[in-house]
Structure formats: structure tokens, C-alpha cells
């Protein structure tokens, strides 16, 4: 059993939302549920796994933000991307690095998803307190 974590972080790398999915689920279908209802979003920065026209339309219409999503190599039309903004994607990578400093999360010691997410939420609270 593998579990994948999808997260939304703010501009300084603090977690706003986190959602677990089974490891074989795709990344892009999870994005709209994570992003819905966020306020004050200027840019959404994501990697190529989240590159889809419907997600770009959702970001533009519902969030009134611009999508800075790396282009999937299989895409025929290439949308523009501001590479200076895209470099800020390291914030999500740094967040997952901070999260995996907690051994129970990194090694996935918990047998149930409820217990695992309990420790993930506790670690997120600890990250907020630092």
C-alpha cells in the first residue's frame, strides 16, 4: 500500500492544505479539490504532472490567478510560463523535506491512513510553530 500526499503551501512554504491519495492515483485530478475555496491567490505554481487545460481554466476562472505550471513534454501547444515565478516551486519541495524530517512520516510507520494523517497534521502544526 502506497500513499501519495498532495499539498498546497503559501509563499513562504507553510502548509495550507494537505490531502492523501492512493499511490496509483494521478496528480492532476486532486488539484481542483485542493485549490477550491482559496482566497487571495495570485499565482499557482505546479510541476508538469498538473499540466492540464481544465486545471488552467479552473485556476483562471475560480481563483482569478495565473497558472505557472511547467509544460508536460507530450503537450502540443505550449502556454507561456514566467520562469522567475516558477523557481519559487522549491517552497513545496522544502515543505516535503521538512515533513520527512519526522521519522514516522518518512518511514510510513502507521498502518492506517487515519493514524498516518494524524501524524502528518501534527508535523504540519510543528512546521507552522517554527
From Swiss-Prot:
Any Pfam family hit: DDE_Tnp_1
Keyword Membrane: no
Alphabetically ordered keywords of this record: DNA recombination, DNA-binding, Transposable element, Transposition
InterPro entries the UniProt entry points to: Transposase_11
GO biological process: DNA transposition
Keyword Plastid: no
GO molecular function: DNA binding; transposase activity
Superkingdom classification of source: Bacteria
Functional description taken from the UniProt entry: Involved in the transposition of the insertion sequence.
Entry similarity comment: Belongs to the transposase 11 family.
Name this polypeptide is given: Putative transposase for insertion sequence element IS6501
Organism expressing this protein natively: Brucella ovis (strain ATCC 25840 / 63/290 / NCTC 10512)
Amino acid at each position: 500500500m502506497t500513499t501519495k500526499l498532495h499539498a498546497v503551501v503559501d509563499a513562504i512554504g507553510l502548509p495550507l492544505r494537505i490531502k492523501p491519495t492512493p499511490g496509483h492515483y494521478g496528480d492532476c485530478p486532486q488539484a481542483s479539490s485542493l485549490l477550491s475555496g482559496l482566497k487571495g491567490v495570485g499565482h499557482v505554481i505546479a510541476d508538469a504532472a498538473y499540466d492540464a487545460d481544465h486545471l488552467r481554466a479552473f485556476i483562471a476562472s475560480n481563483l482569478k490567478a495565473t497558472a505557472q505550471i511547467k509544460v508536460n513534454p507530450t503537450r502540443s501547444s505550449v502556454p507561456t510560463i514566467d520562469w522567475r515565478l516558477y523557481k519559487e516551486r522549491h517552497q513545496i519541495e522544502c515543505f516535503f523535506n521538512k515533513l520527512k524530517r519526522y521519522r514516522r512520516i518518512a518511514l510510513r510507520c502507521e498502518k492506517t491512513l487515519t493514524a498516518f494523517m494524524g501524524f502528518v497534521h501534527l508535523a504540519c502544526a510543528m512546521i507552522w510553530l517554527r
